[in-house]
């Protein structure tokens, strides 16, 4: 079977949990042939792969969201729109009719609000030589004037136009790309990747699987609410846009998978039909983390963090917490193990924070072989403000190490279990709560018996529930099931 994986903002440009998940999936199914359609942010990323591509990944197609230039007279031609296309665009802009009753409580448009079939046809039409042919057309501008008056009367028309332009350009560019032929499409998020998967399924009539590690629309909402690049009166417009992209993926998908119960509940709340949803947890090679090389006893207490140095991991809270830990445990050391080149100014700010606090024994190791370092650690720490089901936590648990984790994603489920009869594998603390994080770490540092017990609990939980074999077999079964259904449909139609 040929499977087209569709990634966004991850593999193969960025190391981390989602990218490692993709690498594990592909290498675990040598019987299948994979092609990759990957969506990056900027053209400068082209060819800058952080992973050695598996031998059964036979092709890579790269798309980038950074908008093309509008300069040049050849982009000045506008196009006329059919009534169906106008209605579809109005729906995409949230102006397609009466707003749902729940909209005041939850920004989540109904799943069938947008006529995506019409938009796919419009955005890929030969009439459209460039996105500007649409955005500069009289029909579109008239639609924007009318819609703006009805829904966005509080936004100046010029400002509304440039905001809508910024929203639509990446979407149109994504949907105008070559769509590789495959027997099955698998988007590893919703968003632009999910919409591209919906397009592929629509064009070729093939099954679509969507896997959400985190809930894409919720993550974009959190980013936009905090962002200073979006004016306050435009944030609702942007937030709803990303909810519509996710709704598109839910609508066209044959299966929508996620990693844990709460994510599935959120997907259903956002309009995904429950019968499409399922849970397949992450999985790792448990035995690879047994009997790791350990440091010789030297009186030091080593705290490890397997993490990229980026804002969503909240490294600053980790550093501030370590400053409190250091007051109680002068022998403590903090090892931040992960790429530092993605953080940009944030990474520099973290280093300056360490200096300003006068902290010794904070080490930014950069990218390392995690298995070579885990055995040296006494305790693991995660202070993220958003997560899915972190592979890093599973790796530490498999190594028999206790954790202090913030209460995000499925961290509580991993550490405390969900009725599996095992005890806790660490301590769960509130997000950004420096004092609680530090207190939990100090408590575990002073109780080696508790650390050992939690380490055993964690390793056994991973061995029972989060193995690579189980993860691969679940997806193999799903691929085979959808592939057989597609074969049956094809034979029945002949």
Go through each PLM region and give its residues.
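Glycosyltransferase donor-sugar binding loop
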Residues: 333-348
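Short hydrophobic beta-strand element within catalytic cores of glycosyltransferases
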Residues: 402-405, 409-415
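Nucleotide-activated donor-binding/catalytic signature segment of Leloir-type glycosyltransferases, i.e.
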Residues: 347-367
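Carbohydrate-associated surface elements
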Residues: 262, 283
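Aromatic "clamp/platform" in nucleotide-sugar-dependent glycosyltransferases that forms part
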Residues: 385
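Conserved acidic donor-binding segment of nucleotide-sugar-dependent glycosyltransferases
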Residues: 416-418, 422-434, 443-448
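A short, well-ordered alpha-helix in the C-terminal region of glycosyltransferases
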Residues: 201, 436, 443, 450-481
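Conserved donor-binding/catalytic core segment of Leloir-type glycosyltransferases
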Residues: 293-324, 335
């Amino acid at each position: 079977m040929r499977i087209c994986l569709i990634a966004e903002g991850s593999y193969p440009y960025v190391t981390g949990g989602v990218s490692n998940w993709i690498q594990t999936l592909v290498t675990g199914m040598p019987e299948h042939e994979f092609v990759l359609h990957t969506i990056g942010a900027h053209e400068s990323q082209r060819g800058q792969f952080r992973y050695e591509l598996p031998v059964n990944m036979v092709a890579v197609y790269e798309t980038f969201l950074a908008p093309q230039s509008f300069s040049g007279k050849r982009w000045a031609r506008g196009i006329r729109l059919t009534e169906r296309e106008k209605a579809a665009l109005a729906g995409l802009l949230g102006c397609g009719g009466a707003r749902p009753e729940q909209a005041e409580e939850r920004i989540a448009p109904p799943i069938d609000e947008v006529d995506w079939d019409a938009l796919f046809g419009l955005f890929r039409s030969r009439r459209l030589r460039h996105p500007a042919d649409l955005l500069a057309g009289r029909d579109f501008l008239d639609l924007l004037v009318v819609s703006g008056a009805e829904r966005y009367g509080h936004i100046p028309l010029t400002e509304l136009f440039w905001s809508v332009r910024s929203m639509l350009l990446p979407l149109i560019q994504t949907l105008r790309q070559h769509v590789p032929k495959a027997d099955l499409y698998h988007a590893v998020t919703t968003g632009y990747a999910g919409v591209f998967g919906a397009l592929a399924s629509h064009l070729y009539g093939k099954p679509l699987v969507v896997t959400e590690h985190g809930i894409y629309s919720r993550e974009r909402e959190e980013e936009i609410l905090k962002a200073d690049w979006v004016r306050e009166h435009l944030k609702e417009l942007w937030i709803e846009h990303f909810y519509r992209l996710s709704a598109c993926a839910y609508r066209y998908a044959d299966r929508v998978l996620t990693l844990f119960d709460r994510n599935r509940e959120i997907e259903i709340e956002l309009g995904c039909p429950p019968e499409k949803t399922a849970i397949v947890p992450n999985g790792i090679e448990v035995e690879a983390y047994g009997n790791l090389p350990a440091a010789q006893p030297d009186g030091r207490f080593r705290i490890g963090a397997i993490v990229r140095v980026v804002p969503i991991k909240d490294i600053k809270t980790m550093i501030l917490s370590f400053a409190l830990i250091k007051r109680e445990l002068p022998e403590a050391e903090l090892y931040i193990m992960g790429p530092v080149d993605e953080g940009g100014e944030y990474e520099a700010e973290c280093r300056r924070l360490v200096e300003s606090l006068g902290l010794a024994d904070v080490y930014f190791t950069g990218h390392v072989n995690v298995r070579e370092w885990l055995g040296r650690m006494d305790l693991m720490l995660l202070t993220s403000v958003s997560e899915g089901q972190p592979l890093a936590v599973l790796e530490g648990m498999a190594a028999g190490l206790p954790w202090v984790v913030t209460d995000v994603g499925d961290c509580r489920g991993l550490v405390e279990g969900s009725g599996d009869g095992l005890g806790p594998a660490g301590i769960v603390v509130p997000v950004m709560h420096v004092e609680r994080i530090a207190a939990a770490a100090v408590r575990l540092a002073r109780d080696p018996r508790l650390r050992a017990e939690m380490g055993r609990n964690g390793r056994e939980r991973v061995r029972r529930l989060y193995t690579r074999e189980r993860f691969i077999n679940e997806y193999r079964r799903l691929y085979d099931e959808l592939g057989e259904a597609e074969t049956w449909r094809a034979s029945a139609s002949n």
